[in-house]
Amino acid sequence: MSRYTALFEHLNAANQGAFVPFITIGDPNPAQSEQIIEALIAGGADALELGIPFSDPVADGPTIQDAATRALNSHTTTAICFDILSRIRAKYPDLPIGLLLYANLVYTHTPEDFFKKAKAAGVDSVLIADVPVEMSVPFKAAADQFGIESIYIAPPNADDETLKTVARLSSGYTYLLSRAGVTGAETRAQMPVDHLLTALKEFGAPPALLGFGISEPEQVKAAITAGAAGAISGSAVVKIIEHNLNEPAVMLDKLTQFVKKMKAATLR
């Protein structure tokens, strides 16, 4: 059984949804980044969604772009990211760990080589933000070869054919966008998404996690009430890092408290 399947079964039995924080690995530097991941787990994160820093993150707003810049300026490489992931995996053998990244990072290797290294580091899933569903075949083939779940985005304006394709190709979970555009806590998630959730379930998609603009417990609660399996929050988490760069201990405590608050909102 995959770690995602086990997680969703456990949460359903406990009448809870999932809360999944996102950060960019290496932000603000590799050593602190590892402490940040530990702080998120301490707060009760059900899974992790982690970015590998990239110089041109087109799907991201300024907050996560700045996180990638800080990570790159601290000389974070894909190899360093995999080292950090390996250590986190060794300490937390049951925690689902997903990567959210851009195709160029895969192409600096071959898809097969990248997914082989990801598997060795303990990665469960990969979402490639800038690859459309219809162009994802070589990536999915490499992911399947190494037993890594392929995550696909269900956009808010998707028609039934798109949702059927997403449902057919996805494994692990479905990333449901609350709104169009780039990432960012400044632009709130737009509810309702009930019709998309109903269609995804009808088409047999894996559980949906709602992302983009999730920054408050009320939004997590609304997502789960609408039928999502949980919520992903990125920019709101990264803002805590950004606003506390000169006070690392305060930053870690605020991150843990934020996750606790968001996780508490997942109780059904």
Curated annotation (Swiss-Prot):
CDD domains: Tryptophan_synthase_alpha
Keywords recorded for this protein, A-Z: Amino-acid biosynthesis, Aromatic amino acid biosynthesis, Lyase, Tryptophan biosynthesis
Pfam families: Trp_syntA (PF00290)
Keyword Hydrolase annotated: no
GO cellular component terms given for this protein: cytosol
InterPro entries: Aldolase_TIM (IPR013785), RibuloseP-bd_barrel (IPR011060), Trp_synthase_alpha_AS (IPR018204), Trp_synthase_suA (IPR002028)
Top enzyme category: lyase
Enzyme Commission code: 4.2.1.20
Catalytic reactions on record: (1S,2R)-1-C-(indol-3-yl)glycerol 3-phosphate + L-serine = D-glyceraldehyde 3-phosphate + L-tryptophan + H2O
Keyword Amino-acid biosynthesis: yes
Subunit text: Tetramer of two alpha and two beta chains.
Family: Belongs to the TrpA family.
The protein, known as: Tryptophan synthase alpha chain
Species assigned in the record: Tolumonas auensis (strain DSM 9187 / NBRC 110442 / TA 4)
Lineage: Bacteria, Pseudomonadati, Pseudomonadota, Gammaproteobacteria, Aeromonadales
